[in-house]
C-alpha cells in the first residue's frame, strides 16, 4: 500500500 505497517513479522 502507500504506507508500511509492521505487526510482529508481518508488514503490509
Curated annotation (Swiss-Prot):
InterPro entries linked: Urotensin_II
Entry's localization field: Secreted
User: Coiled coil: is it a keyword of this entry?
Assistant: no
Keyword check for Ribosomal protein: no
Superkingdom of the source species: Eukaryota
Which Gene Ontology cellular-component terms appear in the entry? extracellular region
Give the GO biological process terms: blood vessel diameter maintenance; regulation of blood pressure
- Disulfide connectivity? 6-11
Q: Which Pfam families match?
A: Urotensin_II
What does this gene product do? Urotensin is found in the teleost caudal neurosecretory system. It has a suggested role in osmoregulation and as a corticotropin-releasing factor.
By sequence similarity, the record places it as follows: Belongs to the urotensin-2 family.
Its recorded name reads: Urotensin-2B
